[in-house]
Amino acid sequence: MLYCDAMVKQVLEQGREAADIVLEQLLPPASEHPTAIHQAMRHSVFAGGKRLRPILCMEAGRMIRAASVAGAQSGSHAGSLPAGIEQLGAALEMLHTYSLIHDDLPALDNDDLRRGRPTCHKAFGEAIAILAGDALQTQAYEVLAQIACPAEARVAIIREVAHATGTIDGMIGGQVVDLEAEHKKPDLATLEYIHRSKTAALITASVVSGGMYAGATVADIGRLRTYGQSIGLAFQIVDDVLDLTQTSEQLGKTAGKDKAAEKATYPALFGIEESIHQAETLVEKACAELNEYGEAASTLKDLAHYLVERKK
């Protein structure tokens, strides 16, 4: 095993708890009128999930803060989070959840199961599901507009996140090309565009925005961007593999859907073994990018290794 499993489990558990506390505070109560939309938003946000994007955001902020305050060799895990960064992480999770709600709709992936429970449109109907996704997106930007960092950093973060969720090299653009590539023989350029845009873009923005929140320099942002792009692509490659090798019960979502829909995936192009090798190579690249930060980067490196060894 290439990472400290116990440490990663602790980071994931504490990160999920911190994100959930803030999400509970920020989301309207289920009893708030109009109740249907708020129940649907909460159904999807609190369905479980790894909270990977908030955790990466918070840990990037912790690393940059540790490096800037005490020097890169000063120890990593004991460093404190930049005050208020949890709100930024919560906004990123809202955006991620909105994308899942819309991806699951009949017009797109047509999925019935997400995080081990009925998808939003199965529980509340398509109309409310569409609106719940829209509502999470708009609330995310309301939260981003109020995060507690200098105005210049706040604007840069909003720009970064908006680009990552948009049409040019962003989440929506990746989804469009993914739809267009169905039932066609995949090529590497198209496959990389889909995965880098649809998945890696928001993961990258999570890491970069966490660094920006903590006062990252231009050089820091460049390193964080390379790290985020590398682990984001590795994450999606592993997702492609798990879709073929795990059951629906293990994944908490319908297994085998990519193959059935003839989607462009790394296993379809390279096979499972080579896909795993490529994911591992990307993780090594990501970790090497953070060597500048010494022990302060240990948690982000451990998280990168976790991403390729996870089973769901």
Which residues are covered by each model-predicted region?
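Mg2+-dependent prenyl diphosphate-binding active-site environment of isoprenoid biosynthetic enzymes
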Residues: E17, L27-E289, E295-V308
